[in-house]
């Protein structure tokens, strides 16, 4: 899966965000920055 190398590093952060119950309120494009990860996510349709 070509996306696994992008998603895997984000997993701990996504879990943290979900734990806060705010996933739907956060712009997916800001997650790498918020998590201190230098990455560019493709647009999610």
UniProtKB/Swiss-Prot annotation:
Belongs to the plant LTP family. It comes from Broussonetia papyrifera. Plant non-specific lipid-transfer proteins transfer phospholipids as well as galactolipids across membranes. May play a role in wax or cutin deposition in the cell walls of expanding epidermal cells and certain secretory tissues. It comes from the Eukaryota. The keyword Transcription does not apply. Keywords: Allergen, Lipid-binding, Transport. This is Non-specific lipid-transfer protein. Expressed in pollen. The keyword Magnesium does not apply.
